Amino acid sequence: VLFRSADEYVEAINQKQAKAHNVIIRSFTMDDDIGTMSYATAQADIKSRPVDRNLVDLFAATDNDVRRRCNYDSKRIVNKIITTKFRSEELCLIIAEAHAHLNQETDALGYLNQLRSKRITQDYIAYTIDNLPEVFQQNIKTDATGIPLTKLMSAILCERRKELFVEGDRWFELKRNGRPEFWVAAKGKKFITEKYLYTFPIPKADIRLFPDLLIQNPGYIE
C-alpha cells in the first residue's frame, strides 16, 4: 500500500520515533539527553512565529485537506512535530516530478492524484491537465532545470510543500529550484536571502593551506 488513509496519516505523522505506516527510513530513533534537548529547542523555535502566509494560501482551496489541521492551528502556529523520516509519500512525489520533467503528464498526474486522494477527505476532485490550478505565486519561479514553472510542475511542488512541511525539505527545495531570493522579517529586522547564500563559504584556513587549488565561493569576501 503506497498511501494510508487520512486518519492513519495523522497517527503516523505525530509519531516522533516510531517507524509507523509508510516510513521507510528514520534518522531519529532513540532519546538521549542532548538529542532530546535539541529536539525540544527546535520544536519550540518553530512555534515562536506564525507559519508563512504563503503556505496558508496553498490550502485556501482545499479546506478538507487533513494536512491543514496537522500542520498549523487557527493562529498559524505549528502543530506538526518536526519529522526526521523518509516516507513513501515523498518517493511518490519524486516519481511524479520525474515524469513531469519527461513530459509524461498522464503518469505524473497519476502519482500526484494518488497522494491527494488520501489527504483531501471530502469533495475530492482529481487533477487533470484541463483543471490544474494556475501557477502558484511563490518564491520558486523555475524548476530544477531552470525552466519557468508549468501548471503541472507548480502543482507538484505545492504538494511537496504541503506534504513535507517541517520535514527538513524546504531549504533543499529552494536550492534545487532556482535558488530564489526573498526576505523575511524577524526581531524587527529584515533578512534577505541572496542566491550566493545557498552555498557555504570555504573556510579561510583551507584557502590559506591550498591557495593554488581553492577559490572562495562567489559572494563571500576572501
Predicted regions and their residues:
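Acidic/polar-rich alpha-helix caps and helix-coil junctions
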Residues: 1-34, 53-222
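Acidic, serine/threonine- and glycine-rich low-complexity intrinsically disordered segments
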Residues: 38-41
